[in-house]
Curated annotation (Swiss-Prot):
Name of the gene this protein is made from: aglB2
Catalytic activity: an archaeal dolichyl phosphooligosaccharide + [protein]-L-asparagine = an archaeal dolichyl phosphate + a glycoprotein with the oligosaccharide chain attached by N-beta-D-glycosyl linkage to a protein L-asparagine
Membrane topology type: Multi-pass membrane protein
Residue numbers binding a glycophospholipid: 394
Family the entry assigns: Belongs to the STT3 family.
Pfam short name (any one): STT3-PglB_core
GO CC aspect terms: plasma membrane
Chain span(s) of sequence motif WWDYG motif: 474-478
Protein name (Swiss-Prot/TrEMBL): Dolichyl-phosphooligosaccharide-protein glycotransferase 2
Length: 743
């Protein structure tokens, strides 16, 4: 077997770029920490259990309602496969994204080699190998599920390429591969659905190509479209085994989308799969049938028929099925949620992801004079992925190969017109080096959110709290709590308006008590997200009228230190500290704060002034920063706790002096130890709800515990593996949580 040296070069470059973050001690982002925590606990338990008690506090989290099992099983089996080499699970987990990211590049290379030629494949492979938009979610230390979807699409594309270009009477069998790939993609990520659209769009555009230029390819087009039906069948079968996607029949989003489209779950138990089978697949076949019927028309008339028919079909589809207009945005999912991933990309986002490839993509126009069947297939993916990119920054990754295809093919078309071989090679080298340099800078600039400050604080909680304790922290850090503290956070993975309201002081301690909160984390990182906290609180109708303008918070860095004089600056204000005398310069006007808190060497010094400025100041001398706030922000729970102006319900148990602080929330509490509930406070009732691992409620009973200090778990819980408990005094909830029952 002859070694493809060009492919080896691409593999080496793609691997090198994606392994750069491996040098980092911590994982990138926050989601990977949840995934790794679950894998570790599952391997420890010896089974892929469903009910995870270290997440989703105080209720617990059913992981089968989160992602399909393949997302967690893959790194685990890679670890088991290579454990004989002495690699740890942590290492295996960190390199898994690289493995599938590089494999994606490889399969795209092989596909383009079939659809075009080895030169096109090589240039596109180089562009994709150094494309930061693709690197970001396929690099070491950053484990994300969409990496698998693009991998399976690259497999599907290879199957289509083999079907189109193989000279054999059995070539049509290759069209089983896109069906298998789309189906298997469902086992690895909850939002795998775009792969169906990519394959379907490719089949439809191949049908258009067949209509205009090569009628013999109609059968290929139909088989590609039908392959997605096989994918639906496989995805539906796998769903019963490893869990459905985010539009599954047990998920609230799946129920909502099904209701919107007037669908009922039956044999097919996923809303998107139902939409695909009931609407997208039949409509696509009708469209292809229309093209086949009119294929013998005059070529000029055919163009008019195609354009007019497409417009008419699009209008009819939107009138008859108006909800389909939201298909590209996940049916409106997260439309109002303040997450950067679900906002449209900015020009800066596009430049960071693709750099010069954005401009080089325009060169694809040189290819339009001689469109071939391979172009039709690729354009199906390119058009749909770029359309998705209009809506969400998240799709910078999904569209990365599309940009690489356009720019790579465009550069090939340009350079092949250059007759001088040295100039052609030099030009290509300069372009690739430029793109590589920009991407290299972006990869090296990647920094984890996790750091030693967080790690020490969370390990403290793990070592000094009870297993059933609940932790309140901002949702961005919730997965950190699950991994390092092995405790259940109230919010993680998605915005929580209740937690935002708590930090802003819009709810009282009774709210936290009703959720069983035992520890509250406040940090400088939360204060830096103050505007996001306000925006998240506004998601609740109760607080939709609050405004960022109501809460004034400014972060200032130490910029000058001369003797006893310290100067702190931000874009908007200046703070001068001199021997306890503090002045604030706002818009050129000098004012004095009403209250100032100075933290240094673990001590808090509170200074009050007879000023009426409405300005409040926190100064941290150890870490060299200051916080400026107006009265409304100053009196929020977040700043009251961070500046240690707490009431009797909060006890500071950990502080690093200025980054992360942990408070124990003092309230009537339940501790689960040795199959016994140890009760504190004057509670009168204890409700127990037992569940099987699949989430079925099999036990429910209330007990009177008045004047009791402990309560032993009943022996017969009807096979329950986890128990949710509620500790009450009359109708008031004193504590709440979830425990795993030990045999």
């Amino acid at each position: 077997m002859k070694i493809d040296k060009r492919l080896m070069v691409i593999v080496a470059i793609a691997t090198l770029f994606r392994m750069i973050p491996f040098r980092l001690k911590y994982l990138v982002g926050s989601d990977p920490y949840f995934h790794l925590a679950y894998i570790e606990e599952a391997l420890k338990a010896g089974e892929w259990f469903n009910f995870f008690t270290y997440a989703g506090g105080p209720w617990g989290l059913q992981v089968r309602l989160f992602h399909p099992l393949g997302l967690w099983a893959t790194p685990a089996y890679i670890y088991k496969l290579f454990s004989f080499l002495g690699i740890s699970l942590y290492t295996a987990f960190r390199v898994t994204p690289v493995i599938f990211g590089v494999l994606t590049v490889v399969f795209f290379y092989l596909s383009l080699k079939k659809l075009y030629n080895r030169d096109v494949a090589f240039i596109v492979g180089l562009f994709l190998g150094v494309n930061y938009g693709h690197i970001f979610r396929s690099m070491a230390n950053y484990y994300r599920g969409d990496n698998y979807m693009l991998f399976w699409y690259s497999v599907a594309l290879l199957g289509i390429a083999l079907g189109l270009k193989t000279r054999s009477k059995y070539r049509y069998l290759f069209y089983l591969l896109p069906g298998i790939a789309t189906g298997f993609a469902s086992a690895f990520w909850q939002a795998y659905y775009p792969i169906f659209v990519f394959v379907l769009a490719g089949g439809l555009l191949l049908g258009v190509y067949a209509y205009l230029k090569s009628p013999k390819l109609f059968l290929d087009s139909i088989l590609i479209v039908l392959s997605t039906g096989l994918g639906v069948l496989i995805a539906n079968i796998l769903g019963d085994k490893v869990g459905y996607g985010m539009l599954g029949y047990t998920d609230w989003m799946g129920k909502k989308v099904a209701e919107t489209f007037g669908l009922e779950f039956g044999f097919i138990k996923d809303a998107y799969l139902l939409i695909h089978v009931k609407y997208l697949l039949p409509l696509s076949l009708v469209f292809l049938g229309f093209l086949i019927i009119t294929k013998k028309l005059n070529p000029k008339i055919k163009v008019g028929v195609l354009v007019g028919g497409s417009i008419l079909a699009f209008i009819v589809m939107l009138v008859k099925f108006p909800a389909l207009k939201d298909l590209s945005t996940g049916f409106g999912t997260f439309r109002e949620v303040p997450i950067s991933e679900t906002l449209p990309p900015t020009l800066d986002d596009l430049w960071r992801a693709y750099n010069i490839a954005i401009f080089l993509a325009a060169l694809y126009i040189l290819r339009l004079r001689k469109i071939r069947s391979g172009d039709a297939i690729l354009l199906g993916y390119v058009i749909t992925s770029l359309w998705m990119l209009r809506y969400w920054t998240r799709f910078l990754f999904t569209a990365a190969p599309a940009v690489a295809f356009l720019s790579g093919i465009g550069v090939y078309e340009l350079t092949r017109r250059i007759k001088e071989n040295k100039i052609r090679i030099t030009s290509l080298g300069v372009v690739i080096l430029l793109s590589s340099a920009f991407s290299l800078g972006e990869v090296y600039s990647v920094k984890p959110f996790m750091n030693e400050n967080w790690e020490k604080a969370l390990i403290f909680i793990r070592e000094n709290s009870n297993e059933n304790d609940i932790v309140l922290t901002w949702w961005d850090w919730g997965h950190f709590v699950t991994y390092y503290a092995r405790r259940s956070p109230v919010a993680q993975g998605s915005p929580n308006s209740g937690v935002a309201g708590y930090y802003l002081g819009l709810v009282d301690n009774g709210w936290a008590q009703s959720l069983g909160v035992d520890y509250v984390i406040v940090s400088l990182y939360d204060i830096l997200k103050f505007e996001a906290i306000v925006d998240t609180a506004k998601l609740s109708r109760k607080w939709e009228n609050i405004s960022r303008a109501d809460y004034g918070v400014d972060f200032l860095k130490l910029t000058e230190s001369t003797g006893s004089i310290l100067r702190f600056d931000s874009q908007y204000s200046t703070l001068i500290v001199k021997e306890g005398n503090i002045r604030v310069i706002l818009s050129g006007k000098v004012v004095y704060p009403r209250e100032a808190i100075i933290e240094s060497n673990g001590r808090i010094k509170n200074l009050k002034y007879p000023a009426r400025s409405g300005v409040y100041v926190y100064v941290n001398l150890d870490y060299g920063y200051a916080i400026l706030a107006n009265e409304k922000a100053w009196e929020t729970n977040l700043l009251r706790l961070f500046t240690q102006r707490t009431g009797e319900n909060y006890e500071l148990v950990y502080s690093d002096g200025g980054f992360v602080k942990v408070f124990r929330f003092v309230h009537p509490n339940v501790v689960f130890r040795g199959n016994k509930f140890i009760l504190t406070g004057n509670g009168t009732g204890l409700g127990l709800y037992g569940y099987l691992d699949n989430g079925t409620l099999v036990f429910k009973k209330w007990y009177s515990v008045k004047n009791m200090q402990e309560f032993e778990l009943p022996n017969n819980l009807n096979g329950s593996v986890v128990v949710r408990y509620v500790y009450t005094q009359g109708k008031i909830v004193l504590d709440r949580g979830i425990v795993r029952v030990k045999n």
